[in-house]
């Protein structure tokens, strides 16, 4: 390994320690302290840089000469940023409906961008084909132990900030990488008793479907507007997570997720994408209250942490269009 590359590979992780702040507005809605883990302020715009950055650094150590990543947006941006930092070429394969702003961001990071297929799963087939080339390595957006290991850093930060465990952690599930990473982190710090509320939108609810079936299942199509959650088949590891920790799977409608995005913008002055709105809907749509009423969550939660996962796949114009499309007030 050349000296300059060795220095970049051996450097600090590419992710930053993100703020954990109590939200007065969401705490008022929930009736309990709500802490927001602001992963949307990561330099690559989402939590994905934790796991993907770690993966790419490890692959560079092993002599990777070209990275390729299929993505709905966030994973690709994390891979492109990591590749630029490492000085390694990268190809990002996106579904054809990906927004222009995401494509421009990727090209700005120096990535080659290819548009293939209607949904992420189809783009992923192309990425896997490209990864068969000599020296190329496929960067899974969510399904690799190194990815989960990187995401686990988020929980170590939670422990350092909070000291004591929260009553629950709320997160969005797409392919399941964040869920797998948070599970790994909870086990690592001894917080395995902390429930995870795993939120999805209907039409991208591959984890909920897998839990009901007891095995990974493939959705016929991704019909949700939360395209960042658009994996038709969730990682098999997520089913193991549900056995290792208490995982409560909940599904909300697109309208609830988009309404949560608007309310969060008004409350916290931050624009996040519908995938993140799915997690926020646990508060805004009263999911936590219902889980408490059903006895599935403690009626006396000391606090709740909501992971604000990212905001790359949204603009003010897109938000207005989604509100009109879904009939949001």
UniProtKB/Swiss-Prot annotation:
GO CC annotation, single: mitochondrion
Keyword Nucleotide-binding assigned: no
Record GO terms (molecular function): glutamate racemase activity; identical protein binding; L-serine ammonia-lyase activity; pyridoxal phosphate binding; threonine deaminase activity
Taxonomy, superkingdom: Eukaryota
Modification N6-(pyridoxal phosphate)lysine occurs at: 48
Cofactor: pyridoxal 5'-phosphate
EC identifiers of the protein: 5.1.1.3, 4.3.1.17, 4.3.1.19
Residues with N-acetylmethionine modification: 1
One of the GO biological process terms: lipid metabolic process
Reactions catalysed according to its record: L-serine = pyruvate + NH4(+); L-threonine = 2-oxobutanoate + NH4(+); L-glutamate = D-glutamate
Keywords assigned by UniProt, alphabetized: Acetylation, Isomerase, Lipid metabolism, Lyase, Pyridoxal phosphate
Pfam families: PALP
Tissue distribution: Abundantly expressed in liver.
Membership in a protein family: Belongs to the serine/threonine dehydratase family.
Role played: Catalyzes the pyridoxal-phosphate-dependent dehydrative deamination of L-threonine and L-serine to ammonia and alpha-ketobutyrate and pyruvate, respectively. Also exhibits racemase activity towards L-glutamate and D-glutamate.
Subunit field text: Monomer. Homodimer.
Protein name (database record): Serine dehydratase-like
Organism per entry: Mus musculus (Mouse)
Organism phylogeny: Eukaryota, Metazoa, Chordata, Craniata, Vertebrata
Gene name linked to the record: Sdsl
